Regions:
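Low-acidity, Ser/Thr- and Arg-rich intrinsically disordered low-complexity segments
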Residues: 9, 21-22
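Phosphate-group recognition and catalysis centered on beta-loop-alpha active-site segments
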Residues: 52-442
């Protein structure tokens, strides 16, 4: 802590004003959030460190989002910044990509503005989202085709008669479907954490955002941040949502990307200004949009035993060398479920498959999903240490990017690994060298 006599810095003065304003505006925020503010307030009143001050500023933004969501039908988002990308810090391309899976959703409810803002703050290279469509054709950021698991839809008695049963990817599913609600109706809902063992204090604070609002968050960042949107369940969406002039879900999706300047082949000048990867489990959608945009595309791969959602093939079949050779004409990489690369048995890793090596042989990148820090998601081999998992996948398996729920921990690992030098990037190697040093004194 600074001594009490230290002159107040500009950041302290700005934070003092911001905190007071946010506290006054945020009186309707959750008691736990207000309590956190009361603790933080003591930091700047005592002249705390800038790290603590910045943490306070971040919570200020959450309070403001909380207020907007509670008082207006639609939250307020800034328009994309007019700042020239030439003066922004460029996207790092020298190491595997840190892909914020649904934002920093290990901390904040998934696919919300706050989760994406937090991921950018934590060092994400790309913010990832799932794109679905509302009844009236607006594109939104939401993972499930039903609203039941991650919103407060059950509390909205006015929508009690909207529950339906539809066939989704060959199976019947019952719930409140996104496609049965207009954008205004979806905006009236509030998002909650998917997993009960994660922080619940932000439940009910944030609304569903649109694809355009998501893009605005990336473009308004103070450095170049890529976006990684998924064309989600295109077969289902095209069955239930209709656009004028015979347009399809994919047409609307690409149209918005082009509207906001996302274009260019991978690593081209245009792409580096506004990086984007377009992803989908439906290879037919990726092939369809290849005539509309040259932006790089990633073909997602599920469990080998699962059928594809559009062609009813097995993923085992479409990871064959012949299919990889075929799909490389349309995509720059694949995004496999990590267990398809290294199958587990009794929560222990088994022998890795050759999928990564074969993909690289076809000049395809590999971005596996999903990396989560909680013990229940870590194989025993990693001893409840997410750094060990990152080390294994980045250095032993050699993937080109990771989808993670915990952007901050992956960023810190990569910064640590880079600082340790090329000869000492391996965590296991470092531990071995330390052990040798200690043993030399025995």
């Amino acid at each position: 802590m600074y001594p009490l006599t230290k002159p107040e810095s500009t950041i302290h003065r700005l934070t003092r004003k911001s905190v007071r304003s946010s506290l006054l505006l945020g009186v309707r925020a959750s008691p736990r959030l207000r309590l956190d503010w009361e603790k933080r307030r003591g930091v700047w009143e005592r002249g705390g460190s800038e790290e603590d001050i910045m943490a306070s500023l971040w919570i200020a933004s959450l309070l403001l989002f909380s207020l907007f969501n509670l008082t207006v039908g639609r939250p307020i988002y800034l328009l994309p910044s007019k700042q020239d990308n030439k003066v922004k810090q460029p996207l790092q391309t020298s190491r595997p990509y840190n892909i914020a899976h649904r934002g920093s959703n290990g901390e904040i409810p998934e696919e919300t503005a706050a989760a994406y803002m937090r991921a950018i703050e934590e060092g994400a290279d790309f913010i990832e989202t799932d794109i679905l469509a509302s009844k009236d054709g607006s594109l939104i950021c939401f993972h499930d085709v039903i609203l039941d698991d991650t919103t407060d839809i059950a509390k909205h008695k006015e929508f009690a008669d909207r529950k339906r049963t539809y066939e989704v990817q060959g199976s019947n599913m019952t719930g409140y479907f996104v496609v049965d609600f207009t954008l205004d109706e979806l905006k009236s809902l509030r998002v909650k954490q998917r997993y009960p063992f994660r922080d619940q204090q932000y439940n009910g604070k944030f609304s569903i955002i649109t694809f355009e609002e998501f893009i605005a968050i990336a473009l308004d960042a103070n450095r170049i941040v890529g976006i990684y949107p998924e064309i989600k369940n295109p077969v289902f969406i095209n069955q239930h949502v209709k656009w004028p002039h015979g347009k399809k879900f994919e047409d609307k999706f690409v149209g918005l990307l082009l509207k906001y300047g996302y274009k260019g082949a991978y690593m081209s000048e245009d792409w580096l200004k506004q990086p984007v990867f377009i992803q989908s489990f439906a290879s037919t959608s990726l092939i369809y949009i290849s005539n509309m945009t040259d932006s790089p595309k990633i073909f997602l791969i599920d469990d080998f035993t699962m059928p594809t959602q559009d062609t009813n093939q097995s993923y085992w079949e479409i990871t064959s060398d012949s299919f990889l050779e075929y799909i490389r004409s349309y995509v720059v990489g694949i995004g496999p479920w990590k267990d398809t690369i290294v199958p587990p048995e009794n929560n222990h890793l088994t022998t890795p498959s050759d999928l990564v090596d074969r993909a690289h042989a076809h000049n395809l990148q590999v971005h596996p999903y999903t990396y989560r820090n909680e013990n229940s998601f870590l194989h025993f081999d990693f001893h409840q240490d997410p750094y060990s998992e990152y080390e294994y996948w980045l250095n032993k398996i050699g993937v080109d990017g990771l989808f993670t729920d915990f952007t901050g921990s992956l960023h810190k690992y990569q910064e640590w690994a880079a600082a340790s030098g090329t000869d000492e990037k391996s965590a296991y190697g470092l531990l071995h060298k330390i052990a040798l040093m200690i043993s030399s004194y025995d």
